[in-house]
C-alpha cells in the first residue's frame, strides 16, 4: 500500500491543540488497523530543545534512542502507544545543519544553495524518511508555529510541494484554528479562521479539514459560513471543544467522523475504529472515586508544562487505583527548614523531579528530609535521586558540606560527580547520557518488587552520577542501592528499607508511562500515598 501523508497546521494563535489533534487522529487510525507514525516539525533554529529553558519550551521529552525533543512527542507516544525516535522531531536547526554539511561536501555540485529547492528538499526528505523507516501506512506530520510566521514558510512550501510530488490522493491537510467567543458581544467570531485559511491558501495549500478550537458549541450556520468561505465541505468543519480530560478528544473527533473523512479522502480501506477500551478509560477517568494529594517540588512550577510527563504519569497511576491526583505545585525556592512542614502540610506523597542548576536546590533537599523523617511516601527522579543521596549524606552520615560537583565544584564531599566520559566534553547540547539503558535490579528490594523483573530498560538524561566512593558507608547506614548498570558501576535506583516508601531513580520513568499501563515506580508511589 502507498504510504499516505497527513499534515496538521495551525493558525490564529499557538497552543490550540495541534499536537493533541494529531495524536488523537493517530489513535483513531491505529484502532482502524493502520500502522501509524507521527512527527513534529519545529521552526526554531535550535538544533533541539535540549538547552532551552523550560519556561521557553516546556519539558524536554527523551526518546528511546536519546533524542531530546518537543513535549508533543510525549502526547504522541501516550495516545498512540508507540515509541518514537530522533527522526520524529525535526527543527530548522537540524535542516540547515544538514544542508550546510552537504554544501561543504560538494553535494550540490557548485550550485547556489537556496531555500527552494535545497532547504525544502531536505524537509521533504525528512517527511518521506519517516514513512520509509517505519513502513507506516500513514505518516502524520505536525507543523509547529502558526501560519504567517516567517520561520514556518519553508516547511509550508515543502508540504505544498509534496502534493504535487506524490499525488492529491496521498496527501491531506488539516488546519487547526480558533473561533473566539466575545463575551461583551455575546457571539462567536469566524473571521480569524477565515483569514488564517486565506493566508494558508495564499501559500498554495487548500485545507481538506478545518478543526476549530472553541469554548462553546459552533452553530450550524457558522459551520456553513466557514465551509463556504474556506471552500471545504460542511462536515469537514470539526469542533474541538474543551474536554474534561485530554483522553476524551479522540472520542469527540470520532463522533464527528474525522477518521472517516480522512479515510475517504486518502482512499484508505480499513475497518471502523474499535474504541471500546479507550471509552472505558475515559469513563474511568471521569468518575474517579478516590483522591490523593501529591506535592511536586520543583523550580519551574510556574509553568506546569515543564513537568508535563511527570504529571501525566501520576495521573496514569491514579487511574489504576480509581484515584484522582491533586498536584500541589511547590516552588522549591520558597521552601526552607523553618517552613517545610507548612509548605507540605496535608500531602500524601512528595515528588522531586529532574532539573539542572543550583536555583531552589536547598528547598528540594529540605522537602526530601521532611519526607524521610516524617515517613511520607517519596519518589525522586534524576536530580531528585541525586539530592536524596546528598540529603542522606548530610543528615544521616553527618558529612558536612556534602553536595553535587555540578552545584558546588569545591564541595569536600562530592556525593554526586561528573560521569567519567563527560570530563572532556565541552559542548552543552546533545552531550548528556541520553536514551534507553539497562538497569539490573537487586532481589528483595522495593524496586525489584515494583518491576517484578531482574533487568529493566529506562530512559536517561543526565551528566552527573552517584560517586561510588561513598557507596559503602551509605549502605552501612541503610541507604540501599537497588538498581545499577549491569556492570554495577553506575547507580540507577536508591531506596530506604526503614521507610514505608522512599525510592528514587537516576533515569526518567515518566517518559514510558501510558494511560492504560502506568509506569511501575509511579504505580507503587501512588499506591503507597493512598495507604498513608
From Swiss-Prot:
ATP binds at residues 15-20, 72, 241-243. Its EC number is 6.3.4.2. InterPro entries: Class_I_gatase-like, CTP_synthase, CTP_synthase_N, GATASE, GATase1_CTP_Synthase, P-loop_NTPase. CDD domains: CTPS_N, GATase1_CTP_Synthase. It comes from the Bacteria. L-glutamine binds at residues 55, 355, 383-386, 406, 463. One of its GO terms (biological process) is pyrimidine nucleobase biosynthetic process. Residues 293-532 form the Glutamine amidotransferase type-1 domain. Coiled coil: none annotated. SUPFAM superfamilies: Class I glutamine amidotransferase-like (SSF52317), P-loop containing nucleoside triphosphate hydrolases (SSF52540). Mg(2+) binds at residues 72, 142. The active site is at residues 382, 508, 510. Allosterically activated by GTP, when glutamine is the substrate; GTP has no effect on the reaction when ammonia is the substrate. The allosteric effector GTP functions by stabilizing the protein conformation that binds the tetrahedral intermediate(s) formed during glutamine hydrolysis. Inhibited by the product CTP, via allosteric rather than competitive inhibition. Pfam families: CTP_synth_N (PF06418), GATase (PF00117). It catalyses: UTP + L-glutamine + ATP + H2O = CTP + L-glutamate + ADP + phosphate + 2 H(+); L-glutamine + H2O = L-glutamate + NH4(+); UTP + NH4(+) + ATP = CTP + ADP + phosphate + 2 H(+). UTP binds at residues 14, 189-194, 225. One of its GO terms (cellular component) is cytosol. CTPSs have evolved a hybrid strategy for distinguishing between UTP and CTP. The overlapping regions of the product feedback inhibitory and substrate sites recognize a common feature in both compounds, the triphosphate moiety. To differentiate isosteric substrate and product pyrimidine rings, an additional pocket far from the expected kinase/ligase catalytic site, specifically recognizes the cytosine and ribose portions of the product inhibitor. Homotetramer. Belongs to the CTP synthase family. Catalyzes the ATP-dependent amination of UTP to CTP with either L-glutamine or ammonia as the source of nitrogen. Regulates intracellular CTP levels through interactions with the four ribonucleotide triphosphates. This is CTP synthase. The lineage of its organism: Bacteria, Bacillati, Bacillota, Bacilli, Bacillales. The gene is pyrG.
Amino acid at each position: 500500500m502507498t504510504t499516505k501523508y497527513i499534515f496538521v497546521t495551525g493558525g490564529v494563535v499557538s497552543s490550540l491543540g495541534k499536537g493533541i489533534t494529531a495524536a488523537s487522529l493517530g489513535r483513531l487510525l491505529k484502532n482502524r488497523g493502520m500502522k501509524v507514525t507521527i512527527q513534529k516539525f519545529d521552526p526554531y533554529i535550535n538544533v533541539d530543545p535540549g538547552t532551552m529553558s523550560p519556561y521557553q519550551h516546556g519539558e524536554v521529552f527523551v526518546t528511546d534512542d536519546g533524542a531530546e525533543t518537543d513535549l508533543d512527542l510525549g502526547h504522541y507516544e501516550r495516545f498512540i502507544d508507540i515509541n518514537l525516535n530522533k527522526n520524529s522531531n525535526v527543527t530548522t536547526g537540524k535542516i540547515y545543519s544538514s544542508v550546510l554539511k552537504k554544501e561543504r561536501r560538494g553535494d550540490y555540485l557548485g550550485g547556489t544553495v537556496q531555500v527552494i529547492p535545497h532547504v525544502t528538499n531536505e524537509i521533504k526528505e525528512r517527511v518521506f524518511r519517516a514513512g520509509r523507516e517505519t513502513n507506516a501506512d500513514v505518516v502524520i506530520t505536525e507543523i509547529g508555529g502558526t501560519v504567517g510566521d516567517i520561520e514556518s514558510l519553508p516547511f509550508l512550501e515543502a508540504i505544498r510541494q509534496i502534493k504535487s510530488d506524490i499525488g492529491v490522493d496521498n496527501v491531506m491537510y488539516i488546519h487547526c484554528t480558533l473561533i473566539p467567543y466575545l463575551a461583551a458581544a455575546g457571539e462567536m467570531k469566524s473571521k480569524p479562521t477565515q483569514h488564517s485559511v486565506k493566508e494558508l491558501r495564499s501559500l498554495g495549500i487548500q485545507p481538506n479539514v478545518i478543526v476549530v478550537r472553541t469554548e462553546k458549541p459552533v452553530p450550524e450556520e457558522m459551520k456553513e459560513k466557514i465551509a463556504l468561505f474556506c471552500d471545504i465541505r460542511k462536515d469537514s468543519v470539526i469542533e474541538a471543544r474543551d474536554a474534561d480530560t485530554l483522553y476524551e478528544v479522540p472520542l469527540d473527533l470520532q463522533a464527528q467522523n474525522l477518521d472517516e473523512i480522512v479515510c475517504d479522502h486518502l482512499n484508505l480501506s480499513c475497518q471502523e475504529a474499535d474504541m471500546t477500551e479507550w471509552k472505558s478509560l475515559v469513563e474511568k477517568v471521569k468518575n474517579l472515586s478516590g483522591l490523593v494529594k501529591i506535592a511536586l517540588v520543583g523550580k519551574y512550577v510556574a509553568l506546569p508544562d515543564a513537568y508535563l510527563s511527570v504529571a501525566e504519569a501520576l495521573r496514569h497511576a491514579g487511574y489504576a487505583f480509581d484515584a484522582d491526583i491533586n498536584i500541589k505545585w511547590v516552588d522549591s525556592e520558597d521552601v526552607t527548614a523553618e517552613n517545610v512542614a507548612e509548605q507540605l502540610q496535608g500531602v500524601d506523597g512528595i515528588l522531586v523531579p529532574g532539573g539542572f542548576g543550583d536555583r531552589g536546590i536547598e528547598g528540594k533537599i529540605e522537602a526530601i528530609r521532611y519526607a524521610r523523617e516524617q515517613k511520607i511516601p517519596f519518589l525522586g527522579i534524576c536530580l531528585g535521586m541525586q539530592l536524596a543521596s546528598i540529603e542522606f549524606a548530610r543528615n544521616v552520615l553527618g558529612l558536612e558540606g556534602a553536595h553535587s560537583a555540578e552545584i558546588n565544584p569545591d564541595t569536600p564531599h562530592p556525593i554526586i560527580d561528573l560521569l567519567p566520559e563527560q570530563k572532556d566534553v565541552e559542548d552543552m547540547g546533545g552531550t548528556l547520557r541520553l536514551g534507553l539503558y539497562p538497569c539490573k535490579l537487586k532481589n528483595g528490594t522495593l524496586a525489584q518488587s515494583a518491576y517484578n523483573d531482574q533487568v529493566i530498560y529506562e530512559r536517561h538524561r543526565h551528566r552527573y552520577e552517584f560517586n561510588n566512593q561513598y557507596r559503602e558507608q551509605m549502605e552501612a547506614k541503610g541507604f540501599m542501592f537497588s538498581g545499577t548498570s549491569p556492570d554495577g558501576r553506575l547507580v540507577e535506583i536508591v531506596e530506604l528499607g526503614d521507610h514505608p516508601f522512599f525510592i528514587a531513580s537516576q533515569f526518567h520513568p515518566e517518559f514510558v508511562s501510558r494511560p492504560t499501563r502506568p509506569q511501575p515506580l509511579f504505580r507503587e508511589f501512588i499506591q503507597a500515598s493512598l495507604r498513608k
